[in-house]
């Protein structure tokens, strides 16, 4: 059976995966871009945006693993956009422009489904009001023999971990303190017992922690 993977998921030292006060102007809330600066400097990120250059080393080695072998993605509505409640209209098409970097079916979990949204480059957003297990069933069907990536945000990743549906979890611990926002680890005591855990820290103090199901 295909695996369920999480890649390049950044949290602060105090466990927050996004800041407080997310909005259209501040997608990451008061954290701004600090959780993701390590990723923005990689070749993988720059190539996703049609840019040359970018660093190599450990950050690039782990960042580049996010795409190979992926046939579908699942994300929460808060990752897709800043709106809450019923959709005012169908004009919002995500943060990523006309050609999002996914190039696969993407299943957006929301209590307010809307028609599917095909984009350039092979990405189609499907909007589901579904449990993690049901969303995964549909994503696996779309992915065929390829893996399914859980793209975030923290509430969605936490729900899939609580349901024991994730096989590979790559967490990036960034050396900042946020103090508030949305935490990842709440109610997941003993999670590490399910996995083989490895870590490596870069000279800049960013720690990559990988949880792999034995």
What residues fall within each predicted segment?
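Enzymes that bind and transform nitrogen-containing heteroaromatic metabolites
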Residues: 1-214
């Amino acid at each position: 059976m295909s695996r369920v993977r999480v890649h390049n998921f950044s949290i602060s030292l105090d466990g927050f995966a996004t800041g407080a006060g997310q909005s259209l102007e501040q997608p990451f809330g008061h954290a701004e871009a600090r959780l993701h600066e390590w990723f923005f400097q990689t070749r993988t990120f720059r190539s996703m945006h049609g840019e040359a250059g970018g660093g190599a080393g450990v950050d690039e080695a782990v960042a580049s693993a996010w795409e190979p072998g992926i046939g579908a993605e699942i994300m929460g509505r808060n990752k897709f956009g800043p709106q809450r409640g019923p959709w005012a209209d169908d004009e919002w098409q995500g943060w990523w422009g006309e050609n999002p970097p996914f190039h696969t079916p993407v299943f957006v979990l929301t209590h307010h489904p809307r028609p599917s949204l095909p984009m350039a480059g092979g990405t189609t957003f499907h909007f589901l009001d579904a449990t993690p297990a049901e969303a995964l069933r549909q994503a696996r069907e779309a992915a065929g023999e390829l893996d399914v990536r859980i793209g975030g945000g923290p509430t969605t990743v936490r729900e899939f971990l609580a349901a024991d549906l994730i096989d590979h979890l790559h967490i990036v611990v960034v050396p900042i303190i946020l103090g508030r926002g949305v935490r990842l680890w709440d109610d997941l005591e003993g999670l590490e017992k399910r996995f083989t855990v490895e870590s490596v820290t870069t000279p800049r103090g960013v720690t990559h922690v990988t949880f792999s199901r034995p």
